[in-house]
Amino acid sequence: MSRYRGPRLKKIRRLGALPGLTRKTPKSGSNLKKKFNSGKKEQYRIRLQEKQKLRFHYGLTERQLLRYVHIAGKAKRSTGQVLLQLLEMRLDNILFRLGMASTIPGARQLVNHRHILVNGRIVNIPSFRCKPRDIITTKDNQRSKGLVQNYIASSDPGKLPSHLTIDTLEYKGLVNKILDRKWVGLKINELLVVEYYSRQT
């Protein structure tokens, strides 16, 4: 299944707020229309909905998300928490959380077009996994800096998660540590996502 490129408002009406996909939020009372079915069908619908929220928020294909679930499942810690950490440490998401792009798709374009450096080297792979002490910058030219300038200026410093630091004058971000669960930027029940995939095998 390919990455979703359709109407974004349609998705948030069905799944709720997806800040990584769009800044728009569903109108009160218009989102998450609940259909109460009995037994297994209702449980399946809830698990599927959580999985879809995760996929569309981070802008992943079904195959990509499944691969992350498999990697997380091999860890000795909670599969759900490891899954969220893997997704949050993607370069495109780090740029979004730093406030250098308004959405994850926007951050992905910055990476694809070679505007972003990690530790002084150009990285053009949005799924690049960042690690503590990584330094994220734009290329040292007016065009690259101009692409992130307005986003950084309008971002709310209070929303910056504790594992990241941003230098707004130098257009430079720092990964301080692995993300804590409480700073995940999406309201999600990751255990239901893990359950969804465990029941598919």
Curated annotation (Swiss-Prot):
Q: Does the keyword Aminoacyl-tRNA synthetase apply?
A: no
What PROSITE patterns does UniProt report for this protein, alphabetically?
RIBOSOMAL_S4 (PS00632), S4 (PS50889)
> Which GO MF terms are attached to this record?
rRNA binding; structural constituent of ribosome
User: What does the entry give for GO biological process?
Assistant: ribosomal small subunit biogenesis; translation
Q: Name one GO cellular component term.
A: small ribosomal subunit
Short name of one Pfam family for this protein? Ribosomal_S4
Residue limits of the S4 RNA-binding domain? 89-157
Q: Does the keyword rRNA-binding apply?
A: yes
Where in the cell? Answer: Plastid, Chloroplast
Q: InterPro entries annotated for this entry?
A: Ribosomal_uS4, Ribosomal_uS4_bac-type, Ribosomal_uS4_CS, Ribosomal_uS4_N, S4_RNA-bd, S4_RNA-bd_sf
Q: Which UniProt keywords apply?
A: Chloroplast, Plastid, Ribonucleoprotein, Ribosomal protein, RNA-binding, rRNA-binding
Record's function text:
One of the primary rRNA binding proteins, it binds directly to 16S rRNA where it nucleates assembly of the body of the 30S subunit. With S5 and S12 plays an important role in translational accuracy.
Per the similarity annotation, which family is this? Belongs to the universal ribosomal protein uS4 family.
Q: Note the subunit structure.
A: Part of the 30S ribosomal subunit. Contacts protein S5. The interaction surface between S4 and S5 is involved in control of translational fidelity.
Q: What is this protein called?
A: Small ribosomal subunit protein uS4c
Q: Could you tell me which species this protein originates from?
A: Hordeum vulgare (Barley)
